[in-house]
Regions:
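Long, terminal "pre-/pro-" and other extracytoplasmic accessory regions
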Residues: 1-79
Length: 79
């Protein structure tokens, strides 16, 4: 039996660590230099334990959803 999300230690504990992982995902997927990426908005969902980070670069924007416990990117949606 595994503990609930509230009892598990989160690897993405801070907003800065979530932004860092999101930028890393964007640089790998879209081949963009990290200094060209701007953080537009961040949100933490207490119910699911997921971080949502909106990033923008050039004329593109994307929302990245990450699991705060496993510190992995779950999905990247370009908008």
């Amino acid at each position: 039996m595994s503990p609930g999300i509230g009892l598990m230690k989160r690897r993405l504990e801070t907003e800065e660590s979530a932004i860092s992982l999101a930028i890393s995902g964007i640089t790998k997927k879209f081949k963009v230099k990290p200094n060209k990426i701007e953080c537009l908005e961040t949100k933490y969902d207490n119910d699911s334990g997921d971080w949502y980070v909106a990033l923008g670069w050039k004329d593109k924007k994307a929302v990245i959803r990450m699991d705060s416990v496993q510190a992995v990117i779950l999905e990247i949606n370009e908008i």
